[in-house]
Each structure stands twice: as C-alpha cells, then as structure tokens.
Amino acid sequence: MANSVRVAAVQMTSMDNIAANFATCSRLVKEAAAAGAKMVCFPESFSYVGFNDVNTVKIGEPLDGPIMKGYCSLARESKLWLSLGGFQERGSDDEHLRNTHVLIDDVGNIRSTYSKIHMFDVDIPGGAVYKESGFTEPGKDIVAADSPLGRVGLTVCYDMRFPGLYEQLRFNHEAQVQA
C-alpha cells in the first residue's frame, strides 16, 4: 500500500507512580518499534493518575522538566514520533495545571503542544461530582501540526464532545488526522 504509515495506539492503565508509568510506556514504545510503527499514540494521563486533584497538581511540571525530557529521550532512542495525549503541565500558579497534548518527533524534539480547551465538569444529583475546571486551566489555541501521518489535529479526551473543534481543525487548520 503506497503512502502508508504504521501507528501504534496504546491502551494502558496509569497509576500514581511516574517511574512505573514511564517503564510501561518505554516497553510499549519498544514493542511498537519492533512492529514497524513510526508513531505511538498514548492516552490522556499516560504519565500519572493521582488519587486526588491535589496530588495531580503537585506533580505538574513544565515542558522542559524531567518527565518530558524522559519522553523526548525515549522518542530519540526509539526513532519514533510520540503523541502524548494528556500531560500534567504546570499551570500559571501552584493550584492549577494544563492538560497538554504533546507531540514529539523521532529525534526527540517537541514539535507541538495543545492544552485542552473543554474541561470535564460533572455534578450528578445524589452521585458523583468532578470539576476538572477547579484545578485545570483551559487552553485557548486550536493546534494542528505536521507529522509522518500528515497534518494532525491535537485534542484531549473530552474535547471529542465538541464537533466544532474538529471542524475548525479540518477546515481552518487543514488537519488530515485527529489525535
């Protein structure tokens, strides 16, 4: 098949252990490389899932911090592009973070980032209450970037509930693939 690119879509269970999650991601990247993939797509919260919002905010790091440097090295060593579906990027203060999709190329450079625009807030009467907006700063920019797959529109999880975002990615930002 002409112009085909093999992509690995990863499903994993993250936990509150950054090192264990990185070890899992590293193993999955090696498996993808052995299978001939050019890009590996990870889910939201691939690097960490905390017991509560306070723990999650505490581990937030800048994009040039040790967690992301590890993933940049992993991309470089494996010679694969990594689409990291939702990283806990440090926010503008100690009480907030950004839920950031990071695209890393096969030489370990961050090619693009997108901070999740649509926050997941739910209040079920007599049931669960979750307010992502209480600890996460929404992004402002719609982002598409060139990759081995073509032009990729970057989004995070709950964004899928907002078709207008995908219309803008396709028609205003010329995205050919949505990630």
Annotated model-derived regions:
Residues 18, 27-107, 111-115, 121-122:
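Cys-nucleophile CN-hydrolase/nitrilase-fold catalytic domain and related Cys-dependent amidase chemistry
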Residues 63, 90-173:
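Active-site catalytic loop in hydrolytic enzyme cores
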Residues 2-7:
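Extreme N-terminal starter segment of soluble prokaryotic enzymes
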Residues 20-30, 162-169:
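Short, acidic/polar
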Residues 38, 175-178:
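Short acidic/polar active-site loop segments enriched in Thr and Asp
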Residues 11-16:
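Short polar catalytic/cofactor-binding loops
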